[in-house]
């Protein structure tokens, strides 16, 4: 069951004292876009996932860190490149990506949430734009759809 239907991904972001912002925990939502919309679900830690992340490893595991490209804004959880790679390699996927983050926040995410998690591979999806995010002390956010 979907908790709510929204028109902006700002409705799924919340303040996080360690990272600046993260996804709202325990969310089940449909976001509407120009293609009709997509579904997202977050776990209790506030990461886009249909499962809770646990340390005990039962098969190959890949951890993903990144910004909106790795979090996959505009795409349902199961259609993200991280999840498709997990299916292809028969691996468990923990996607720690958060929209709008730089590599500094991604490092903090690893340090706080994933440092003790057993993994076979860690993938960091980084864009040149992330370097600019790291350099600024304050960055105003603008929603992609509403431009506000």
Task: Give names to the regions the model predicted.
Residues 1-25, 104-148:
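Interaction-surface signature
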Residues 34, 52, 58, 92, ...:
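Glutamate identity and glutamate-enriched acidic tracts
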Residues 61-65, 94, 122:
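Conserved beta-strand elements of the Class I
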Residues 69-71, 99-101, 127-131:
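Short, solvent-exposed loop/turn segments at secondary-structure junctions
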Residues 86-107, 112-115:
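A conserved hydrophobic secondary-structure block that centers on an alpha-helix together
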């Amino acid at each position: 069951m979907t908790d709510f239907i929204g028109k902006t991904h700002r409705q799924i972001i919340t303040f996080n004292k360690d990272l600046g912002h993260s996804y709202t925990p325990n969310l089940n939502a449909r976001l509407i876009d120009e293609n009709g919309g997509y579904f997202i679900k977050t776990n209790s830690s506030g990461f886009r996932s249909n499962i809770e992340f646990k340390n005990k490893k039962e098969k190959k595991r890949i951890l993903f860190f990144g910004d909106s490209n790795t979090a996959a804004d505009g795409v349902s959880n199961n259609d993200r490149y991280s999840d498709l790679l997990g299916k292809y390699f028969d691996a468990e996927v923990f996607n720690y990506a958060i929209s709008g983050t730089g590599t500094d926040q991604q490092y903090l995410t690893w340090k706080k949430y994933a440092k003790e998690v057993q993994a076979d591979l860690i993938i960091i999806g980084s864009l040149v734009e992330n370097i600019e995010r790291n350099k600024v002390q304050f960055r105003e956010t603008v929603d992609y759809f509403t431009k506000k």
